[in-house]
Each structure stands twice: as C-alpha cells, then as structure tokens.
C-alpha cells in the first residue's frame, strides 16, 4: 500500500506519503483554491521523483479539506493521475467517531481528523489546540467522542489585521519576543509581544475555563502550523504533536479499508 494523504487548510496544503509502515515523505504548498489538477501534478511529480516514486506507486488517496472549492480539483488529481477514487472527509469517508454536538454536520473535517488522531495516542478527555488560520480548541471525551470546542482567530490573522487596519503598523514576522520580554521598547517589539503573549494568555485562559467548566483533569495537545512557536512558553500545553492530523487521516483510511473488506 502506498497512500497519499492530502490535508488542506486555509493557508497551507500538506501532501504526505505512507508506505504501509511509516511516513516516507511530507511536503507543503500554499493553499490556492483555483489550482487545477494539472498544476498540482506538475509540482507533485517533481517531489515524487526526488523520493524515487512514480505515479503508479500511489494506490490510495485520502483528502481532508476545509476549502470546498478546492475539493473538485484534488479529487480530479486522484482520479486522472493516480487512477484512484479518493476517500474524502465529509463525503464518502466513514470516520467512526461519535460527534456529540447540536449540529454534527457543522463540525469541520480538520477538527474531526485531529480528534481521531489524538484519541489514538493520548488518554482522554482531551483538549486539542490547532493553531492555523484559526485557532481551535476541541474537546475529545474519554471514549473518543468529539464534544465541541472553541474557534478563535489565528495568530497570523491577528498580526495581518493589525497591519491592514492601522496605517502606521508594519507587517512583521511573528516570533517570540527577545529575552521573553513582555513590554516592547519599539513598535515592532511591542507588536510581537502583544500578539505572542496575547496568544499565550488566550491559550492559558481558555484551557483553564474549559477544565473548570468540565470539572475534570484533561490532557492538552497542540498541533498546527505555528504551534511550535509556543513550546516552552506555557505550562498549559502537555504535548506538542505535529503529526496529529496525518495520523488521524491514516486511521480513517484504515477504518474504511477494513469496512470494505
């Protein structure tokens, strides 16, 4: 088995190859909703070649996307170039997770995949924090069920909004303030401090409120594109896990394969 897992967020799209035993390659590209199957394959073919793989090596594809207008092109990529009918989260893939919220159809594909990936490794109940375009806090019960969560603006979105809405504030890179200083001494350091420590306080405050509301100890896992930025800056996060989403996709693929056999 050679599985191509595609995880598409609003900002980045990840392509990962699993050979049945381990992940052998991972690549990221900027998410562009208008990118065609032909454009994807030109880019992907070069990367596959660097790994010594050809199109014929791929015999399974699973897709998770939060960008509806991109799914057609990703599905077309799978059908035309790999001759594979893909599993698509939210369409033909059976997730095998109990979704205990008022409107289960509104649960984002990425959030459910993360919940499955987390429940495979960590004993629940869990808080799964995904730091991307949005920062989400999702609750996974002790039995693995998805029980809702919180959606907040992402750190990059907040920094972008500062720059675009305030004429004198520059566009800057997001990074941890030098020397862990709280108070900035110029515009750039003040912005970095506000966004970085503001998000640390967001994480610490919401995790504390979630635990208080539920009245039980919970394990907190962080994943996502900028999660590593917070490592060592707070005691509210127990584990940083960059493989959470692709682990969930692999498990969903296996569940569907078993169901079909």
UniProtKB/Swiss-Prot annotation:
Subcellular location: Cytoplasm
Enzyme nomenclature, EC number: 2.7.1.33
Family per record: Belongs to the type III pantothenate kinase family.
Names of required cofactors: NH4(+); K(+)
Biological processes per GO annotation: coenzyme A biosynthetic process
GO cellular component: cytoplasm
Binding positions for K(+) per the UniProt entry: 130
Gene3D superfamilies associated with the record: 3.30.420.40
Disulfide bonds: none
Keyword Kinase tagged: yes
Annotated residues for binding of ATP: 7-14, 133
Amino acids binding substrate: 108-111, 187
Active-site residues, as the UniProt record annotates them: 110
Protein name: Type III pantothenate kinase
Pathway: Cofactor biosynthesis; coenzyme A biosynthesis; CoA from (R)-pantothenate: step 1/5
Subunit structure: Homodimer.
NCBIfam families (alphabetical): baf, PRK13318.1-2, PRK13318.1-6, PRK13321.1
UniProt KW keywords: ATP-binding, Coenzyme A biosynthesis, Cytoplasm, Kinase, Metal-binding, Nucleotide-binding, Potassium, Transferase
Comment on bound cofactor: A monovalent cation. Ammonium or potassium.
SUPFAM superfamilies linked: Actin-like ATPase domain
Domain of life per record: Bacteria
């Amino acid at each position: 088995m050679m599985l191509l897992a595609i995880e598409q967020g609003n900002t980045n799209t990840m392509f990962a190859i699993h050979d049945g035993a381990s992940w052998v390659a991972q690549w990221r590209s900027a998410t562009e909703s208008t990118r065609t199957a032909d454009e994807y394959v030109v880019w992907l073919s070069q990367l596959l070649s660097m790994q010594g793989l050809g199109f014929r090596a791929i015999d399974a594809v699973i897709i998770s996307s939060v960008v509806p207008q991109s799914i057609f092109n990703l599905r077309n990529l799978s059908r035309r170039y790999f001759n594979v009918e893909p599993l698509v989260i939210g369409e033909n893939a059976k997730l095998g997770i109990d979704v205990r919220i008022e409107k289960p159809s509104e649960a984002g594909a990425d959030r459910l995949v993360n919940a499955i990936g987390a429940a495979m490794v960590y004993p629940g109940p869990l808080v799964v924090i995904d730091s991307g375009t949005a920062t989400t806090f999702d609750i996974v019960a002790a039995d693995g069920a998805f029980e809702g969560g919180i959606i907040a603006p992402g750190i990059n979105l907040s920094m972008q909004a500062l720059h675009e809405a305030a004429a004198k504030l520059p566009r800057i890179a997001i990074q941890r303030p030098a020397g862990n200083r709280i108070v900035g001494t110029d515009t750039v350091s003040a912005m970095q401090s506000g966004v970085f420590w503001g998000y640390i306080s967001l994480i610490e405050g919401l995790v504390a409120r979630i635990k208080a509301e539920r009245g039980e100890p919970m394990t907190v896992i962080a994943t996502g594109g900028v999660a590593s930025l917070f490592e060592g800056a707070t005691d509210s996060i127990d584990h940083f896990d960059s493989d959470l989403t692709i682990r969930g996709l692999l498990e969903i693929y296996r569940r569907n394969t078993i169901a079909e056999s």
